[in-house]
């Protein structure tokens, strides 16, 4: 099995194959991807759709000398397999295993790290310009999907690239949202070869030289050319950016891909190749439902993904989706906004019930935030459902367009904290730190499902921008109360009180997901636990009260320590004039790799065992409780 694939340990071996062997190789590679992902979980549909394109790129271009940048990067499993990582695929997205995205420190073939969308053209352009300046004759190649192509950053890069006449840049649009009928496919195969050929390029340049003496005639000739292309191919928009547009061609047809890429390799200046592929190609179940098979867990390929048993605990995403529908039922001003994450953010039901108030703005986080600001300015109640890691992309809009004008936009921040298999690129480690420093912001962290629901309702009542953060996955099992009640603004609650005498009293100030492990640790230590609820406005009175009645303070958060919730507590203590030893626990000052979330939290010392150990080492074993004032960060 996989006899041909087993001979390919790097692209050099691939390039030694006869062209007639490439389709059998593609069949083996697709089968290997399916078999591998079914055993580990991961992204499937997108990878099944890029098999032939990946083979063609490594066959035609001299990788890694020529640089391929894969936008988003979750479609790179065939690339990883062909570049020496076939035997590591069983470790995919696991602790200590290979990443599900390109990583520069994993392979020289991963020329640029990606995971967020629409960055590839900028990176490939930078590489191509560097090649031009150094004279090392390498091609910069960006492979970008039709969804990522909608983002502003992609067009900013296109606009910049179009003025670089002789830069060795190729942008490949991997369009998997349309299909080519056989007649059109045959016509476009012929057209792509024609438009990417040397004769066409030379003739085009010659006509331009002749007509340059008569600018009106040159403009007319260009318009006629665009019109001729426009009759049989889409997207002459890219010609306006200064690219030579080629395609669309069938991205599963190696006999079309390879000669077209070989022709493009000989051209200079920015080239744009439109390739049409199908998500889930070659696996009927994924072809029929590419969304279901986008990022599955382990499954039996022969049977497909079976409906999961109803879980005993709701996910926080489900809690948000139910709340949003309930809120919209009560108030016609409630608007739901997502930047291309309808399923992931739990908004499927909202779209069905309130289609006129549902807005999927595409992969455009900056626009999503300012769009929400405009709605809020006109009296609507916009709710932006966004992953923590993607909110980073709209930070200026958050400050300039929403907070500065004190507009009441609700930010429902999903995937806060560590996210597991997707790794550092998707971790929500920084939102507490970057939100709490913004004037006019209210910031809450949910400790369980019902608190999340009530916090979202509280946020909707505020006259200012408000954020509620909650983690990926299942909650704690707490039932949600249908009745929605606003929480007292900026007030935490005591969840457990110590029975220790003076001199041994420790108070743990826990935020969001860290309340549960802090309570478990407190049982071992007999410590007080406060569920702080609000990061901003912080319950400074509660912080001061606990400091006055305890001998040491511990802050615990699933976020970066520097500038985070613990820092807010230290600032409050300093302002109150009460000094106590403080231990700040949180995510370390490094990027956390992929792996099982529970194992990652344990490795960071943020499970009950780790919290207990850190407190004992800092205070109880060292005898620091009751000693001189100090602050220590454990991260």
Swiss-Prot record:
Binding-site positions, thiamine diphosphate: 74, 115-117, 147-148, 176, 283, 365
Biochemical pathway: Metabolic intermediate biosynthesis; 1-deoxy-D-xylulose 5-phosphate biosynthesis; 1-deoxy-D-xylulose 5-phosphate from D-glyceraldehyde 3-phosphate and pyruvate: step 1/1
Listed EC numbers: 2.2.1.7
Any one annotated GO CC term: cytosol
Catalytic activity: D-glyceraldehyde 3-phosphate + pyruvate + H(+) = 1-deoxy-D-xylulose 5-phosphate + CO2
Comment on bound cofactor: Binds 1 Mg(2+) ion per subunit.
GO terms under biological process: 1-deoxy-D-xylulose 5-phosphate biosynthetic process; isopentenyl diphosphate biosynthetic process, methylerythritol 4-phosphate pathway; terpenoid biosynthetic process; thiamine biosynthetic process
One family name in Pfam for this protein: Transketolase_C
Sorted UniProt keywords: Isoprene biosynthesis, Magnesium, Metal-binding, Thiamine biosynthesis, Thiamine pyrophosphate, Transferase
Molecular function GO terms recorded: 1-deoxy-D-xylulose-5-phosphate synthase activity; magnesium ion binding; thiamine pyrophosphate binding
Protein residues bound to Mg(2+): 146, 176
Known cofactor(s): Mg(2+); thiamine diphosphate
Record HAMAP family: DXP_synth (MF_00315)
Subunit structure, interactors included: Homodimer.
Family: Belongs to the transketolase family. DXPS subfamily.
Known function: Catalyzes the acyloin condensation reaction between C atoms 2 and 3 of pyruvate and glyceraldehyde 3-phosphate to yield 1-deoxy-D-xylulose-5-phosphate (DXP).
PANTHER family on file: 1-D-DEOXYXYLULOSE 5-PHOSPHATE SYNTHASE-RELATED, 1-DEOXY-D-XYLULOSE-5-PHOSPHATE SYNTHASE, CHLOROPLASTIC
Protein's name according to its UniProt entry: 1-deoxy-D-xylulose-5-phosphate synthase
Gene name tied to this protein: dxs
């Amino acid at each position: 099995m996989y006899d041909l694939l087993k001979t390919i340990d790097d692209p050099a071996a691939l390039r030694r194959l006869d062209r007639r062997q490439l389709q059998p190789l593609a069949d083996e590679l697709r089968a290997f991807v399916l078999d591998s992902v079914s055993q580990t979980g991961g992204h499937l549909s997108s990878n099944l759709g890029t098999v032939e394109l990946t083979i063609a790129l490594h066959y035609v271009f001299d990788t890694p000398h020529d640089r391929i940048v894969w936008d988003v990067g979750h479609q790179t499993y065939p690339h990883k397999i062909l570049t020496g990582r076939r035997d590591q695929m069983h470790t995919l997205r696991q602790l200590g295993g290979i990443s599900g995205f390109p990583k520069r420190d994993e392979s020289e073939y991963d020329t640029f790290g990606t995971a967020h969308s629409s960055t590839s053209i900028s990176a490939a352009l930078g590489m191509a310009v560097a090649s031009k300046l150094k004279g090392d004759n390498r091609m910069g190649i960006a492979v970008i999907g039709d969804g990522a192509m909608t983002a502003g950053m992609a067009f900013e890069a296109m606009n910049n690239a179009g003025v670089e006449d002789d830069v060795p840049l190729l942008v490949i649009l991997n369009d998997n949202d349309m299909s080519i009928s056989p007649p059109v496919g045959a016509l476009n195969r012929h057209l792509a070869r024609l438009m990417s050929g040397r004769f066409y390029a030379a003739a085009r340049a010659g006509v331009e030289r002749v007509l340059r003496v008569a600018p009106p005639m040159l403009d007319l000739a260009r318009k006629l050319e665009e019109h001729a292309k426009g009759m049989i191919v889409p997207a002459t928009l890219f010609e306006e950016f200064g690219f030579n547009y080629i395609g669309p061609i069938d991205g599963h047809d190696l006999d079309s891909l390879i000669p077209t890429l070989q022709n493009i390799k000989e051209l200079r200046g920015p080239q744009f190749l439109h390739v049409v592929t199908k998500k889930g190609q070659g696996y009927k179940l994924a072809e029929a439902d590419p969304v279901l098979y986008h990022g599955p867990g382990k499954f039996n390929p022969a049977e497909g993904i079976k409906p999961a048993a109803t879980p005993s605990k709701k996910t926080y995403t489900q809690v948000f989706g139910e709340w949003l529908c309930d809120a919209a039922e009560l108030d016609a001003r409630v608007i739901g906004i997502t930047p291309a994450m309808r399923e992931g953010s739990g908004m499927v039901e909202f779209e069905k019930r309130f289609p006129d108030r549902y807005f999927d703005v595409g992969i455009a986080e900056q626009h999503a935030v300012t769009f929400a600001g405009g709605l809020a300015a006109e009296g609507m109640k916009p709710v932006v459902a966004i992953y923590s890691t993607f909110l980073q992309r709209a930070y200026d809009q958050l400050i300039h367009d929403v907070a500065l004008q004190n507009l009441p936009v609700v930010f429902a921040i999903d995937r806060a904290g560590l996210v597991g298999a997707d790794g550092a690129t998707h971790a929500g480690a920084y939102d507490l730190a970057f939100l709490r420093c913004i004037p006019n912001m209210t910031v809450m962290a949910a400790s369980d499902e019902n608190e999340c629901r009530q916090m979202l309702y509280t946020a909707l009542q505020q006259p200012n921008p408000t954020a509620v953060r909650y983690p990926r996955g299942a909650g704690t099992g707490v039932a949600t109360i249908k009745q929605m009640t606003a929480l007292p603004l900026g007030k935490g609650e005591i969840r457990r009180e110590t029975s220790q005498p003076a001199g041994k009293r420790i108070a743990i100030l826990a935020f969001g997901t860290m309340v549960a492990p802090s309570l478990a640790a407190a049982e071992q230590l007999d410590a007080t636990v406060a569920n702080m609820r609000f990061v901003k406005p912080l319950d400074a009175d509660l912080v001061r009260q606990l400091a006055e009645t305890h001998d040491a303070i511990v802050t615990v958060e699933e976020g970066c320590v520097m500038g985070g919730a613990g820092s807010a507590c230290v600032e409050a203590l300093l302002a109150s004039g009460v000094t106590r030893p403080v231990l700040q626990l949180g995510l370390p000052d490094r990027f956390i790799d992929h792996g099982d979330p529970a194992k990652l939290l344990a490795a960071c010392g943020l499970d009950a065992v780790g919290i207990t150990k850190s407190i004992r080492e800092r205070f109880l074993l060292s005898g620091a409780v009751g000693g001189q004032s100090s602050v220590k960060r454990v991260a």
